């Protein structure tokens, strides 16, 4: 089974997240994309105290109508920081026959060398770096951390960097949606409409539960 992994704080999940998942699913013929909300993200401090369970519920609402999308709460079942390598190891134990495609924004990939055990991530799965506004990668090989660059070989015909482990790094350009969770939170706090930025069930849930208002 070819399985995509899309992690994030999802605070809240929005249409750009969903479109990225769909573009990668389509481009790489994935059987499923698993959305994995981060319980305690090491790279992005959480703004506000939005509980993990609430963010998971928003992801469930956003993905409920797509049989190719699934949601996992495995990071909420662990203590400590939500390191991606720990999540990958757990998924490989749970689903030993799957081939995983780790989906990451180009902005995060450019900082990949600062990630916990990033070398092990390259040896654990395929990686799909997805273009994000303001973070275009023009030379994928140059974006690889210098310390591990000799472990890769570029395959021009397939536009991928093959790692010595057998996995590859790909770059997917041209996903134009520029939507930010922080802008959605700001609109919600001001009582303004967030319609068409998030799926309708998520917008309703945010409004009904007063998730981003101070008097929640």
Swiss-Prot record:
Q: Which SUPFAM superfamilies match?
A: Nucleotidylyl transferase
The record ties this protein, via Gene3D superfamilies, to: HUPs (3.40.50.620)
Biological processes annotated in GO: NAD biosynthetic process
EC number of this enzyme? 2.7.7.18
Q: Which reaction does it catalyse?
A: nicotinate beta-D-ribonucleotide + ATP + H(+) = deamido-NAD(+) + diphosphate
Alphabetic keyword roster: ATP-binding, NAD, Nucleotide-binding, Nucleotidyltransferase, Pyridine nucleotide biosynthesis, Transferase
Is ATP-binding set as a keyword in this record? Answer: yes
Pathway per its UniProt entry is: Cofactor biosynthesis; NAD(+) biosynthesis; deamido-NAD(+) from nicotinate D-ribonucleotide: step 1/1
Q: What NCBIfam families does the record point to? A: cyt_tran_rel (TIGR00125), nicotinate (nicotinamide) nucleotide adenylyltransferase (TIGR00482), PRK00071.1-3 (NF000840)
Q: What does this protein do?
A: Catalyzes the reversible adenylation of nicotinate mononucleotide (NaMN) to nicotinic acid adenine dinucleotide (NaAD).
What is the name of the protein in this document? Probable nicotinate-nucleotide adenylyltransferase
The organism named in the record is Geobacter metallireducens (strain ATCC 53774 / DSM 7210 / GS-15)
């Amino acid at each position: 089974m070819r399985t995509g992994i899309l992690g994030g704080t999802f605070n809240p999940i929005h249409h750009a997240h969903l479109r990225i998942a769909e573009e990668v699913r389509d481009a790489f013929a994935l059987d499923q994309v698993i959305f994995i909300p981060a319980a305690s993200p090491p790279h992005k401090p959480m703004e506000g105290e939005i509980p993990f369970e609430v963010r998971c519920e928003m992801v469930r609402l956003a993905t409920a109508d797509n049989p190719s999308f699934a949601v996992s709460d495995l990071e909420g079942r662990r203590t400590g920081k939500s390191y991606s390598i720990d999540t990958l190891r757990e998924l490989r134990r749970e689903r030993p026959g799957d081939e995983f495609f780790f989906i990451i924004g180009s902005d995060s990939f450019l900082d990949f060398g600062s990630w916990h055990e990033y070398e092990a991530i390259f040896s654990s799965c395929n990686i799909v770096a997805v273009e994000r506004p303001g973070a275009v990668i023009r030379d994928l090989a140059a974006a690889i951390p210098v310390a591990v660059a000799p472990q890769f070989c570029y395959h021009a015909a397939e536009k991928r960097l093959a790692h010595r482990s057998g996995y590859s790094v790909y770059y997917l350009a041209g996903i134009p949606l520029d939507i930010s969770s922080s802008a959605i939170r700001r609109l919600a706090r001001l009582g303004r409409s967030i319609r068409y930025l998030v799926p309708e069930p998520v917008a309703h849930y945010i409004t009904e539960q007063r998730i981003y208002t101070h008097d929640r």
